[in-house]
Amino acid sequence: QRQMCIRDRKYGTRDPFEIMDQMNIVVGETSRYKTLKGYCFMSCKTIYVMISSFLSEEEKMIVAAHELGHIILHRSQLKMAPMQDDTLYNMTDNTEYQANLFAADLLIEDEDIEEMVQNEDLDYFGLCSSLNATPELMSFKLYSLTKRGQAYHMPMEIQSNFLAK
């Protein structure tokens, strides 16, 4: 719920890069690590996010939203050590799980899903395609909606390593 409040009331956008810019978070790209998708850290009270330059634009958006989730939900942990993500959509680590739900809720509007599912000709992958969402990100979104009391059938399990492919 926090991501919706942030987006709608304070920043007025779903774009994690725009939100981080408004929050004065320094965002950069790195080609230093081949397997690391992104990481965030705090130094001298400034928050930094680094995203792999090897990723597609779609993956960069997802990683940025995921790292923003860490910044908003787990800020106190940033003071201790960088938060690194070499595999997104990890279901075993609670902080990663929370950042994944945050990213899905930030990037995909509840109303867009409600509108799209009214179309009986649209299957799960058609829904993903129509909303420019990966099937894995959509799984997190539908799981989030289900946790909030809306009934959606999830035809695929949440995969913890889909960006590792």
Segments (PLM) and residue ranges:
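Active-site hotspot residues in diverse enzymes, especially metal/ion-binding acidic/histidine motifs
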Residues: Q1-K165
